[in-house]
Design a protein with these regions (language model features):
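Extended, well-ordered alpha-helical scaffold segments
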Residues: 17, 21-24, 38-49, 96-107, ...
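Aromatic/His-enriched, Gly/Pro-containing loop or helix-boundary segments
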Residues: 114-156
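Acidic/polar, glycine-enriched structural segments that form the non-catalytic walls/loops
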Residues: 1-78, 151, 161-164, 168, ...
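Well-ordered alpha-helical scaffold segments within catalytic/enzyme domains
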Residues: 32-35, 85-98, 135-149, 236-255, ...
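Extended glycan-interaction surfaces of carbohydrate-active proteins
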Residues: 36-75, 103-123, 176-229, 267-359
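Aromatic- and histidine-enriched alpha-helix N-cap/loop-to-helix transition segments
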Residues: 76-86, 95, 127-135, 155-159, ...
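Tryptophan-centric aromatic hotspots in well-structured domains and transmembrane helices
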Residues: 83, 121, 138, 163-171, ...
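Short, conserved secondary-structure transition motifs
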Residues: 125-131, 166-174
Length: 361
């Protein structure tokens, strides 16, 4: 071929001009990658996946970054999972403010009439029975700390506050938080995710961990529509959510709401402390039917560190006796999604319901 060719959406550009645009983009990419000398390959992998998954949604005139194109194609063009999308926004905030804003606003705007951001949302369908772990306020706060634009906080605050209150009103048993799935009539239209409505499967899906061995033997209460399990991971993330929202409320001058959130964080911090097992040296999930601790260990038990609930001695025990324990979580590849000694560790199986979810280990 004698002359270079180029494919473009701007027919006014010549092949040479397009080549210059590409060269400049490659130079910018190399400069960004050089900012992470300790993990350039990780940065490149992350940005490559995010770029591939970022699409235009013409129905809503927005740019979004779904969890994968493989999920989006059979879902009507796009599908947003709650915490996946917030995490995408967080990662995108490294060097693309606009995409970080777009994704955080998009998933927050999918909030249901009941007041929670759903597990998943796609054209014409939302999971109206369940949410997913409350990570939105933390991500929004972190993005704000980088770019300091208050309009962004104003855009999402009231929705995030409704969602925060929803957890306390709808997922509390005896002062603890647990995952659930509320039954509802979805009519004549059927979708594969509807098989989890109002049952244990749906409650597991609300955790975002789907087939985690933590939940293998948990009882689902058909009266409360929740797992009978005081969940360390959920309570820790909720405490972080309360604190993050309280910081946002302070920035926005919402003093009374700030106090409400600080008090709520304190309340659940006290309850989380009752899940400390001195014998094990770790915060453990508690079976709310028997009152006994569960010894199915997973990384979510370390979320209590993020919530800053353990004191120094407790934190040291958690790290020395469990994180750095090669029989549990330490090793060449960390962290496995279940302790290495757990019988389920060898399964290495993706979720039978959601084949694209990560393996157990």
């Amino acid at each position: 071929m004698a002359e270079p060719i180029a494919i473009t959406t701007d027919p006014s550009k010549t092949a040479e001009e397009i080549g210059e645009i590409i060269d400049k983009a490659e130079a910018r990419w190399a400069a960004r990658k050089s900012q992470y000398p300790e993990a350039p390959d990780a940065y490149e992998a992350m940005q490559t996946v995010l770029a591939w998954n970022t699409i235009y949604d013409p129905g809503n005139d927005r740019v979004i970054s779904p969890v994968s194109r493989t999920w989006s194609v059979p879902s009507g063009g796009w599908v947003l999972f709650e915490w996946d999308t917030y995490f995408a926004a967080y990662m995108l905030s490294l060097d693309c403010k606009e995409l970080a804003y777009a994704n955080a606003i998009a998933i927050t705007s999918e909030i249901t009439d009941k007041g929670f951001v759903p597990n998943n949302s796609q054209p014409g369908i939302k999971s109206l029975d369940r949410s997913q772990p409350p990570v939105g306020a933390f991500v929004v706060k972190e993005i704000y700390k980088k770019y300091r634009e208050k309009w962004f906080l104003d855009e999402v605050f009231e929705k995030l506050l409704r969602w925060n209150r929803w957890w306390a009103d709808n997922r509390e048993i005896d002062g603890y938080l647990s995952y659930g799935s509320d039954p509802y009539d979805y009519g004549d239209t059927y979708h594969r995710s509807f098989s989890g409505i109002g049952n244990l499967k749906g409650a597991k899906w609300e955790s975002g961990l789907d087939n985690s061995p933590m939940y293998d033997d948990v009882v689902y209460d058909r009266m409360t529509h929740q797992m009978l399990l005081a969940d360390v991971g959920l309570m820790s993330l909720y405490i972080i959510d309360c604190r993050s929202l309280s910081e946002i409320a302070a920035v926005l001058g919402k003093t009374e709401v700030e106090k409400e959130l600080v008090q709520r964080a304190a309340k659940y911090s006290v309850m989380l402390e009752t899940l400390w097992d001195a014998e094990s040296g770790l915060y453990l999930n508690r079976d709310l039917l028997t009152g006994e601790f569960s010894h199915r260990l997973s990384p979510t038990l370390f979320y209590s560190l993020l919530a800053k609930v353990p004191d120094l001695k407790q934190a040291e025990r958690m790290m020395k006796e469990h994180f750095y324990n090669p029989q549990e979580f330490w090793g060449e590849f960390i962290m496995p999604s279940v302790a290495r000694y757990d019988p389920a560790f060898k399964d290495n199986m993706p979720s039978p319901q959601l084949p694209l979810k990560e393996d157990r280990r």
